[in-house]
Amino acid sequence: MAETLSGKTPLFAGSTGGLLTKAVEEEKYAITWTSPKAQVFELPTGGAATMHEGENLLYIARKEYGIALGGQLRKFKITNYKIYRILPSGETTFIHPADGVFPEKVNAGREKVRFNARSIGENPNPSQVKFSGKATYDA
């Protein structure tokens, strides 16, 4: 998925502390969002920046920074942020929210992952599962 990201980088006086140097060998992340007005927000790595009115694009070193920044943006009632992984080859992958709905929201179409329809008292004996060759979530 070679997607072109657009937007202005927020204004901040400072540096990333060398965190983006790993992007040359590994990967970097980008978060995009749309702001109704220019306002100051806290960066997940420390410090503050001023977002632009309209589209914003910020490159970050870790996905966790994007999740934390998303929490900061929600304080401003901005919920349309998206997080992308960018490989050194230039390949861009959309990673959050993966199915378009944030994890803490209910999505009727979302499939349950590793779900067993039983109570904890109905779980099998761990000693019987250990050497059976089955994974614990399949037992």
Swiss-Prot record:
Membrane topology per record: Peripheral membrane protein
GO process terms (BP): photosynthesis
UniProt keyword list: Membrane, Photosynthesis, Photosystem I, Thylakoid
Keyword Membrane included in the entry's annotation: yes
InterPro entries reported in the protein's UniProt record: PsaD, PsaD_sf
Primary location recorded for the protein, binned into one broad class: membrane
Pfam families (UniProt xref): PsaD
One GO cellular component, as annotated: plasma membrane-derived thylakoid membrane
Keyword set includes Transcription regulation: no
Annotated localization: Cellular thylakoid membrane
PANTHER family: PHOTOSYSTEM I REACTION CENTER SUBUNIT II, CHLOROPLASTIC, PHOTOSYSTEM I REACTION CENTER SUBUNIT II-1, CHLOROPLASTIC-RELATED
Description of how the protein assembles with itself and partners: The cyanobacterial PSI reaction center is composed of one copy each of PsaA,B,C,D,E,F,I,J,K,L,M and X, and forms dimeric and tetrameric complexes.
Function, as annotated: PsaD can form complexes with ferredoxin and ferredoxin-oxidoreductase in photosystem I (PS I) reaction center.
Family note: Belongs to the PsaD family.
Name of the molecule in the record: Photosystem I reaction center subunit II
